[in-house]
Amino acid sequence: MIDGISTAGLGLPDYDLACRQHADYVAALENCGLVVTVLPPDQEFPDSTFVEDTAVMLPNAVILTRPGALSRRGEVLEIRPTLEALVENISMIQSPGTLEGGDVMMVDTHFYIGLSERTNEAGARQMITILESCGLTGSMVALDEMLHLKSGVSYIESGNLLAYGEFIDKPEFKQFDIL
């Protein structure tokens, strides 16, 4: 984690604080009735705490991504056995496609896929094909400023989006109430 990729310019993370925050996060999820699987730390992949980038969960399937950051691609192989124990229907994004889960936002049965430094059009098109095979839909949203789609926008249910920066006026989100 200390050697992870960062664009925030905040310096090195405080490892002990991050461990406490992670434990609190797991406890909060468990208090909501969720079953949490905690994987052992892997020094080879310092960004592996961000599991959303390596796998996108669908209602009855999972899409294993192909991260745009080369240093993260091995994480997909590491998390696959854990997901295989939970989900039968597994698809993978293939080269030349790249896709990271931070660029994927689910709104009901539709998925918005950000085209970013980490997710390209080939990866987004593959994801849309997989979504359609599962009875879901997807569309692409070009990013100009943010690292990931969800760096600047989050769906908070009931037609509401929490948006920041370039996402406030995106035509793709005009049907939502922007907060």
Features from the language model and the residues they span:
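The feature marks the mature, well-folded catalytic cores of soluble enzymes
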Residues: 1-179
